[in-house]
Amino acid sequence: MSEPEIKAVLSKINWDTPLSTDDLYLVFTEAKQQIGGIDKKWLYTRILNSFNWYTVMKIIPREEWPYLLSDKIIDNLFPRQLRNKYKHVRSALFE
């Protein structure tokens, strides 16, 4: 996805933070490790909670999927059914 497309997606998950979409993009691209308590773990959790898997696949580069689908991220998802869904996705892709 292009930078404007990614920023459009990030703007949809940024409804409750004082940060700008540009700040989130810096964390997303790892130009900054953390801004105001927002890190990549927070972004990935929010993306998985907000979008379907097909949208997630377009946003997150494939080489990031092992981290995206790690327990560190999945354990923060809500509701439990969503956690189970992404555990099944992980097992289908990596096991």
Pin down the residues of each PLM region.
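Long, compositionally biased intrinsically disordered regulatory segments in eukaryotic proteins
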Residues: 1-95
